[in-house]
Amino acid sequence: MTRMPKVQVCYALPERQTLVAVDVPAGASVRDAIAASGVLALHPDIDASALKTGIFGKLAPLDAPVADGDRVEIYRPLIVDPKLARQRRVDKTRREGSIEGRKWLPKDSR
């Protein structure tokens, strides 16, 4: 008799993390593992139609197969545009007057 693959399904919020271990049939997909875990019922705020998922930090489509020991991750949408976040960090560094921040300013204003 073959053993059913065991996978973990995780979803993380800033204040709470969920990690559920489930047994899935051989040949199961990411979608099957998520459905078997019940994570979508635990977190009704997850938009199932726009689900971004991965396996061990690498993006994976919902129909990707899972293997024994995989960790299926459900990703949240970005809150801030990465370019905007970086620009805010640069502006803050410049305001604080660090050498790192000042090197991008014109020479006459350093």
Swiss-Prot record:
PANTHER family: UPF0125 PROTEIN RATB. The lineage of its organism: Bacteria, Pseudomonadati, Pseudomonadota, Betaproteobacteria, Burkholderiales. NCBIfam families: PRK01777.1. This is Protein RnfH. It comes from Burkholderia mallei (strain NCTC 10229). Pfam families: Ub-RnfH. InterPro entries: Mopterin_synth/thiamin_S_b (IPR016155), RnfH (IPR005346), RnfH_sf (IPR037021). Belongs to the UPF0125 (RnfH) family. It comes from the Bacteria. Residues 90-110 are annotated as: Disordered. Disulfide bonds: none annotated.
